[in-house]
A protein has these predicted regions:
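N-terminal, Lys/Arg- and Ser/Thr-rich interaction peptides
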Residues: 1, 30-42, 175-178, 185, ...
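Basic- and hydrophobic-enriched, low-structure N-terminal and domain-boundary segments
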Residues: 1-142
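Generic recognition of flexible, low-complexity loop/linker segments
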Residues: 31-33, 240-244, 280-281
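P-loop NTPase catalytic phosphate-binding loop
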Residues: 44-46, 101-232, 252, 260-320, ...
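Conserved ATP-driven motor cores of ASCE-family P-loop NTPases powering translocation/secretion/packaging/pilus
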Residues: 57-67, 295-369
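Short helix/loop segment immediately N-terminal to the Walker
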Residues: 230-251
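SF2 helicase catalytic motif II
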Residues: 255
Length: 369
């Protein structure tokens, strides 16, 4: 028996020891399952007939028990639903199992210069998030980042904006006229939408209906770009499945910070116009290379329509994690979902649409040195 197999066997025995005292009240039930350890996860194999019920609660209990017990040897990835796999075996009693995705070790925070981050992008075509986690925005379009003050949300928005401004075109919509807008201004980006801070005597100072109308105007301009690109792709491409890259268009990133603040003081008609425009960009923008990155403290339905939230692939929540504040962005979770990394700029992440990622896992956003 080789060293790798010995280590695998020791890990399986350890997992069985952990489950033995917690999973079942009847010790005899520990003989009614087996475990398989794969490169991408673990399979719990019930040996039928069994005297316990397998359901979502049972699946979640196994996850919660092993979540801490396997750290830091493995990082468990919380699936969005119970995962059942079919096994190739001649034994009818063991032809199916519960799959728990996990990765060996833990992902690490990037502490790099912006030049190093950009170099990573040009090597892979994906935006780095951690050393072994990155964002393929073509496969997984649009992003939403939530977190309370002090969570590191604004810092990470600035990091993303710097990256996206180098690899494509970008616009900054910032109702506070704060970090994001100042960064865009410093970089010489003219596509900045901020409120009017100095009163001109017309009552249009600060955030409110007039500012939201300015935002809608900017978004409708981007919508026109989207339709123009779609028209040119349709007219000039012979491919059935294609996108903006075939015609050499750059990706266009729309950053909206503190989205909830945009709606302050606006009437219903203007709010509806904003949300309808936002929805069209989110739903139709992918093929044309239009990508939205939204940030807010909480992704409540009154701020982000359900169709918008469901169409966003990259979801990040930074700061304190509990069942109350995860229910808007991660409604699948009903309790503490995994072992947090701790520290500023940490939280949880899920990337839908990319087969390399299968659920929710811890994140620590990059630190630019």
């Amino acid at each position: 028996m080789g060293f790798k197999q010995k280590k695998t066997n020791l890990m399986l025995e350890y997992i069985k020891d952990v489950l033995r005292y917690i999973l079942f009240s009847n010790s005899d039930q520990n003989a009614e399952y087996d475990l398989l350890l794969k490169d991408d996860g673990m399979i719990f194999v019930p040996i039928y007939p069994i005297t316990y019920v397998i359901d979502e609660a049972f699946y979640n209990k196994i996850f919660n028990v092993l979540n801490l017990a396997l750290t830091p040897e493995y990082t468990l990835i919380r699936p969005l639903t119970m995962q059942v796999v079919v096994l190739e075996t001649a034994n009818l009693s063991q032809e199916r199992g519960l799959f728990f995705p996990m990765r060996k070790g833990t992902a690490n925070r990037l502490n790099e210069t912006m030049e190093q981050i950009i170099q990573r992008f040009y090597q892979t075509g994906r935006i780095p998030i951690m050393d072994i986690i990155d964002w393929d925005f073509v496969k997984a379009p649009h992003a939403i980042i939530t977190g309370v003050s002090g969570s590191g949300k604004s810092y990470y928005m600035k990091v993303l904006f710097q990256i996206c401004s180098i690899i494509g075109n970008s616009i900054a919509i910032d109702p506070k006229g704060s970090d994001l807008a100042r960064l865009a201004h410093k970089q010489g980006n003219e596509d900045i939408v901020i409120p009017q801070f100095i009163s001109s005597g017309n009552g249009e100072q600060g955030i409110g209906g007039k500012f939201l109308q300015d935002v809608i105007k900017a978004l409708k301009n981007i919508e026109s770009i989207m339709y123009e690109r779609q028209s040119r792709i349709y007219q000039n491409s012979d491919k059935v499945s294609t996108d903006y890259r075939e015609l050499g268009f750059k990706p266009y990133f729309v950053f909206i910070d503190e989205l909830a603040a945009l709606l302050t003081g606006a009437n219903k008609a203007v709010k509806d116009d904003f949300q309808n425009t936002l929805t069209r960009l989110i739903v139709l923008g992918r093929e044309a290379g239009i990508y939205l990155i939204l940030a807010m403290q909480s992704a409540r339905a009154e701020y982000v329509p359900t169709i918008v939230r469901d169409s966003i692939s990259l979801r990040i929540q930074l700061g304190r994690i509990n069942s109350e504040n995860t229910r808007f962005l991660f409604p699948e979770l009903n309790e503490m979902p995994m072992v947090p990394m701790g520290g500023k700029g940490t939280g949880i992440i899920s990337i839908a649409g990319d087969s390399r990622y299968s659920g929710i896992e811890p994140i620590a956003t990059p630190t630019i040195i």
